[in-house]
Amino acid sequence: VANPPFSLDKWGADTAVADQHNRFHRGVPPKSKGDYAFISHMIETTYEDVGKVGVIVPHGVLFRSSSEGQIRKKLIDENLLEAVIGLPANLFFGTGIPAAILIFNRGKEANKDILFIDGSREFESGKNQNKLRDKDIEHIVSAFKAFKAATPLTSEKGAVIEDKYSYRATIADIIENDYNLNIPRYVDTFEEEAEVDIKATQATIVDLNKQLSAVGIQMENY
């Protein structure tokens, strides 16, 4: 479990090419963004078949292309990614950007589904920093436990677990989205605007204008 520096510049890409531990066999991350360097190191140092990784990352890790996109694709194709959990903005010291938790599991076996959670709207606002409440954490944990306990999907299309909060994606979903893990592609949080009753609104405006005229007449008598 780790919270490495977000998009660290000059992380050591020049020496990673000849890494004696072969940690970057999926590709070398860009010199200016070390996010996947930390992820690669963590995964390669866990036990085969049982190792698990939880890492906090900026959202760019979910969708940036080029070498990062290739690394992300290989991690997914190897069935290592288990969950993508979106967090609220302004949660960490030193940055106000929203972050996500990536869960990797080297023991997923035949289950290729990936859980997406949008927890970005559940938090307690603070003067300088937001915080996750106990109930917000429990919501995330319970969604993850339910995902783990459920039977893997047999269809190519994923399924909504909780409306506007969590989604169980299949590998077909991921491929359809070109391995882009941006959470809104999977969790639909769109809120429809309430339908406006035009006639009722017009009647209210007429009534308010009448009241305004009556007040104006009263004021003229003073």
Give the role of each language-model region.
Residues V1-Y222:
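A conserved structural/catalytic subdomain of Rossmann-like adenosyl-cofactor enzymes
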